[in-house]
Design a protein with these regions (language model features):
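Cys/His-clustered metal-coordination modules, chiefly Zn-binding fingers
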Residues: 142-220
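Short helix-coil boundary/hinge micro-motifs
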Residues: 1-176
Length: 220
């Protein structure tokens, strides 16, 4: 049986993706699991980090949704059921598109309905299974979910639960798009003044700073 883990902490929604190497295609700057999943497709040309099913499993592993052992189990099952794996990738991209629409529409009012709510509930409807708390080898604790039935269908459940939490807790007013138009990544603004502009100061923020410096030099 395969278990999916989530480091989301109810009430704060904080989660900690695993550190990635410099050459990793995965970037985690969204501060929320569902936003980082949206960011697996980014840029004006929409570079897709989920190129194939194995890429998706590696992303889930990097985001700490799957641990190494469980990721290996999913890969073995994908070899045995390639059609199911391919269908789950298509489904994950469909979910990602709905979550992007949610991230980009901003705060919702009582008079504005979110059309993607049906998509969220479609995935949550799969969530038959067992939830439990497990302790890692390093002593930390995680919540885990053991789905009943199709293991592929449960892969995106922790992601959609993260988005559902954001809706319930009214977090959409703090969701931003990176100010660099070439980036297109979204993030949760956890600053006190709510004025964060860049997904990451070390990349997009520094590029903007360098561009302003060049313009300043030209004007002198």
């Amino acid at each position: 049986m395969l278990t999916f883990t989530s480091t989301s902490d109810a009430g704060t929604l904080a989660y900690v993706p695993r550190p990635m190497g410099e050459r990793s295609p995965f970037v985690f700057v969204g501060e929320r699991l569902w936003l980082d999943f949206v960011n697996s497709e980014f840029g004006i040309r929409r570079f897709d980090a989920l190129r194939d099913f194995d890429s998706m499993v590696r992303w889930l592993e990097a985001a700490a949704v799957l641990d190494a052992e469980r990721a290996s189990g999913i890969r073995r099952r994908a070899q045995q059921q390639p059609a199911g794996a391919a269908a789950s990738l298509i489904d994950a991209r469909r979910v990602r598109a709905a979550l992007r629409a949610l991230a980009e529409r901003g705060p919702l009012s009582d008079r504005v309905r979110f059309d993607g709510l049906g998509e969220i509930n479609r995935v949550l409807g799969r969530s038959a299974g067992t939830r439990r708390v497990e302790q890692r080898a390093d002593g930390t604790f995680i919540r885990s979910f053991v789905p009943v039935g199709d293991a592929f269908a449960g892969l995106v459940i922790p992601i959609v639960e993260s988005a559902a939490d954001a809706l319930i807790l009214g977090e959409l007013s703090r969701v931003r798009r990176c100010a660099d138009p070439r980036c297109q990544r979204v993030f949760f603004d956890n600053t006190k003044n709510g004025r964060r502009r860049w997904c990451d100061m070390s990349t997009c923020g520094n590029r903007a700073k360098a561009a302003r410096h060049r313009e300043k030099l030209k004007s002198h």
